Amino acid sequence: MEAFEHYVTVGRRRLRCGYTTGTCAAAATLGAATLLLTGEALPAARIATPSGLEVPVELTRYDAGPGWAECAVRKDAGDDPDVTDGAYVYARVSRTEGGVAVDGGVGVGRVTRAGLDQPVGAAAINRVPRRMIEEQARAAMRAAGYGGGLAVVVSIPEGVRLAERTFNPRLGIEGGISVLGTSGIVRPMSEEALVASIALELRVQRAAGVRDLLVAPGNYGRDFAAGELGLDAGRCVQCSNYVGQTIDAAAQAGFGSMLVVGSLGKLVKVAAGIMNTHSRVADGRRETLAAHAALQGASRDLVGELMRSVTTDEALPLLERAGILRETMASVTAALGDQLRRRAAGALDVEAVVFSPGWGVLGETEGASHLLALLRRAAAGEGGVRPGASMDDGAGPDDASGEKDVRPWAAGGEGPRGLRGEL
């Protein structure tokens, strides 16, 4: 059968795209409906996806009985480290009096919490895949000249097991994985999918009534917030490198405030206006720290030493010996506050706490103490919305104080939004 050969370049790598669980379900629906209505078992199908690409899909594992037929598609995630890669997505189609009804069966989760794509009680088959499934069912009906209706039940037998390796239970999706995809295509290591997963976590918290948001780039920030600041790690949303986009998403979700707890190695970049802290986007840690030290009277020799520091933690003793550590950190956090407020543009209050694992709190933005008090009260009285979970940020060797996040995407492809690259 013809293979799906569509590639993207990520860094210096050429990676093959795959297709989403939604595309699999739509193709399986076409196969099952065609078998039910005409008796023909199609060996393959070409599915038009919302991305504009047509995907060739092999149809397999046919079965039929009185009034129903079933077909399966084996998920191909391409080069994306997707937990559902290789899983079989089934569609069982039966005749009804009219219309097309779509539901989930074994291995497809059920929504139990507001704020997700589908209402509480519905199968976790998102809007775009539902539309794709309905379109393929109707295409089979037209081709067969059938004027009645069809009921489609999508099942993923491995979904119950796979869901244990995803964030679905934390988001309020129980009993299986989600059928996802907005473009029908899995783009390996897609930044859009990572940002969308963060935005979904924010919407779930907001729907649960959370107004004051706690954010950290990764595990270190989350653990510091809980262990040193007395905050609830269960309410911490991890933004990885996407500080600016997380602010945008928090504003869109309607939060009133947001506190970022992060290492100096991460947040010194934000103080320079770098809102995506991935090392391949920009660095500037040493330059920014050296500039603020110079503003506080650092000598030319000290500035040179700071510029030669490999990590920000290595720079801190130099500033302390020069007697300007506190002043430099105050200058950095003031600039950080300015950049956060500029990005928020008045839509919400954004503050930050800057720390180093070996040095503790290094600085706070102007309004951070007020947000800390609000979040401590929430921690004492509410409990968490969801356990924190790390997110791979692809940071450099330091990212300057060990704020290296390690979200195991290969073991959790159906993450908060869903599959890592499913768009």
Residue ranges and their predicted role:
Residues M1-R165, P169-L171, G367:
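Generic N-terminal targeting/processing segments that precede catalytic cores or assembly contacts
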Residues V8, R16, L171-I177, T182-S331, ...:
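A structural signal for small-residue-enriched, beta-sheet-centric alpha/beta enzyme cores
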Residues L30, L36, T60, S183-G184, ...:
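Ubiquitous "structural anchor" signal
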Residues Y88-Y90, E228-D232, T365-L371:
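Surface-exposed flexible segments
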Residues R113, A163, F224, K269-A271, ...:
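Generic domain-boundary/flexible-linker signal
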Residues R130, T333-G384, G388, G418-L423:
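Extended hydrophobic packing segments that form well-structured cores
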Residues R142-Y146, A379-R420:
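Intrinsically disordered, low-complexity terminal tails and inter-domain linkers enriched
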